[in-house]
Regions:
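Conserved Ser/Thr-centered positions that define the repeating blades of beta-propeller domains
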Residues: 1-2, 21, 33, 41, ...
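Surface loop/turn motifs at the tips and blade-to-blade linkers of beta-strand repeat domains
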Residues: 10-13, 61-67, 112-115, 159-162
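Beta-rich catalytic cores
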Residues: 16-17, 69, 82, 119, ...
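Residue-level detector of Asp-centered blade-edge/turn motifs that repeat once per structural unit
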Residues: 23-27, 75-82, 125-129, 171-176
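Residue-level signature of beta-propeller blades and closely related beta-rich strand-turn architectures
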Residues: 35-37, 92, 101, 138, ...
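Loop/turn-rich, solvent-exposed surfaces of beta-rich toroidal or solenoidal domains
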Residues: 134-143, 160-192
Length: 194
């Protein structure tokens, strides 16, 4: 109606109340958490291809061994041509890099040794996939972590941030030291990530 388009995939029952999802705009593929609060479809995403056309969808096994739902799904716009690289966070603080998600996914766990067992709320990607900023949305934990080597080493980037949940993060595309954080107390910014 009025130029809008919608299509339903019937008989699907998956995901959480607000399931994290992200869209690979280069390959026209939507990825979304498939695991429900009840544990159905563990360690899976929903992958929907050809949006706006003859859509094709299905469950996609990730092979991470995770029994909980994914709390964050992030598509990397820096994925090699013709491929989808995803970052998946869990409610238990684990982080995975998934390559080749458009076909047969390959996973690498890049969870930091000191990450809290907490809800991983966002992954921000800098001007390369070596530069990542990860946030957690729990009280009583270090909520902001950064890496400049693709997840081999992680360091706290919380600085003087109070003990508040961080919901989302953005890195400035031309300067990985500049970040915005969406928190329960508003938007915080820094230009001195190290």
């Amino acid at each position: 109606v009025n130029g809008n388009y919608s299509q339903s995939m019937s008989n699907w029952s998956s995901g959480t109340f607000i399931s994290p999802a992200d869209y690979d705009y280069k390959l026209n593929i939507l990825y979304s958490n498939a695991c429900g609060f009840d544990g159905s479809n563990p360690d899976k995403l929903v992958r929907i291809k050809n949006i706006g056309g003859n859509i094709q969808g299905g469950y996609l096994a990730m092979g991470t061994g995770t029994g909980t739902w994914y709390s964050h799904v992030k598509y990397s716009p820096l994925s090699p041509a013709g491929t989808s690289t995803l970052y998946l966070g869990t409610v238990s603080g684990r982080l995975f890099r998934i390559t080749n998600a458009q076909a047969t996914p390959a996973k690498t766990e890049i969870t930091g040794d000191d990450f809290p067992v907490a809800n991983l709320s966002s992954v921000a990607i800098g001007n390369s996939e070596d530069t990542l900023l990860v946030t957690f949305s729990n009280f009583g934990v270090v909520s902001v972590w950064k890496t400049f080597d693709g997840g081999v080493t992680w360091n706290s980037a919380e600085g003087n941030l109070p003990d508040i949940p961080v919901r989302w993060s953005l890195l400035h595309p031309s300067g990985a030291r500049h970040a915005l954080l969406a928190t329960d107390l508003g938007i915080w910014t820094t230009d001195s990530l190290t």
